[in-house]
Amino acid sequence: MAIRKYKPTTSGRRGASVSDFTDITRTKPEKALMRSLHGHGGRNVHGRITTRHKGGGHKRAYRLIDFRRNDTDGVNAKVAHIEYDPNRTANIALLHFLDGKKRYILAPQGLSQGDVVESGANADIKPGNNLPLRNIPAGTLIHAVELRPGGGAKLARSAGSSIQLLGKESSYASLRMPSGEIRRVDVRCRATVGEVGNAEQANINWGKAGRMRWKGKRPSVRGVVMNPVDHPHGGGEGKTSGGRHPVSPWGKPEGRTRKPNKSSNKLIVRRRRTGKKHAR
């Protein structure tokens, strides 16, 4: 993937950039692997906003991604196409299996049309192959990692992300997360070899607010420009700083958003690198 920069023909185009989509081999997705999506605008069943800054955006169809890959062990698959997915930052690869099945997976770095991938304990260590952590050598970069055996990939799924397998001890494997956190995961959990592709996506300059609206993201308003009834930082005569430490609209201090008593915290060996305001 490469990034194409626009000429500054308008204020919105100045500095803006877009992917050149050279890796994409097909623009029409596989119809059998698509489902309709109904937008909720960040509202719950009662119509109240539960997630701010969401709403609108271009209509999308959801692509069914195989995050488990446990029912095609031992069956080789050919990469038929690399496709764009509007629901995620990574590209996706359409696999044609020898038994006739078709599946979508996340497209790792280096995977191209015509390559052959496989899954299972005896799969080779090459990008796109999926196998249990116990069968992957230490030092390998992996992505789409399960947190529980058979639970489907949960970790390292966005464009350019990867996890390093540091080693294995007894029934657990030690993983270095993209954040720097070191976490233990059951060796029966599966992972895909390689890094997630489309890494240059992080360098795209969206250029104007309208492009973010196309993505379904609404404006984020600062608390200090609101009224006191709307935010703890609101009000005051003239331009103010809020007059207190940063808090959420509901008065909770900024940072420390992780659940403190999460059951899986006991498997964290070393916390992620954090700033002072996020330190525990």
From Swiss-Prot:
GO MF term list: rRNA binding; structural constituent of ribosome; transferase activity
Taxonomic superkingdom: Bacteria
Residue ranges that the Swiss-Prot or TrEMBL entry lists as coiled coil: none
Alphabetized PROSITE patterns for the sequence: RIBOSOMAL_L2
SMART domains associated with the record: Ribosomal_L2, Ribosomal_L2_C
Region (Disordered): 213-280
Keyword terms: Ribonucleoprotein, Ribosomal protein, RNA-binding, rRNA-binding
Biased composition, class Basic residues, residue ranges: 268-280
InterPro entries per UniProt: NA-bd_OB-fold, Rib_uL2_dom2, Ribosomal_uL2, Ribosomal_uL2_bac/org-type, Ribosomal_uL2_C, Ribosomal_uL2_CS, Ribosomal_uL2_dom3, Ribosomal_uL2_RNA-bd_dom
Gene Ontology BP, a term: cytoplasmic translation
GO cellular-component term (any): large ribosomal subunit
Gene3D superfamilies in the cross-refs: 2.30.30.30, Nucleic acid-binding proteins, Ribosomal protein L2, domain 3
Pfam families registered for this protein in UniProt: Ribosomal_L2 (PF00181), Ribosomal_L2_C (PF03947)
HAMAP family in the record: Ribosomal_uL2_B (MF_01320_B)
Described function: One of the primary rRNA binding proteins. Required for association of the 30S and 50S subunits to form the 70S ribosome, for tRNA binding and peptide bond formation. It has been suggested to have peptidyltransferase activity; this is somewhat controversial. Makes several contacts with the 16S rRNA in the 70S ribosome.
Similarity field: Belongs to the universal ribosomal protein uL2 family.
Quaternary structure note: Part of the 50S ribosomal subunit. Forms a bridge to the 30S subunit in the 70S ribosome.
Protein's UniProt name: Large ribosomal subunit protein uL2
Lineage: Bacteria, Bacillati, Actinomycetota, Actinomycetes, Mycobacteriales
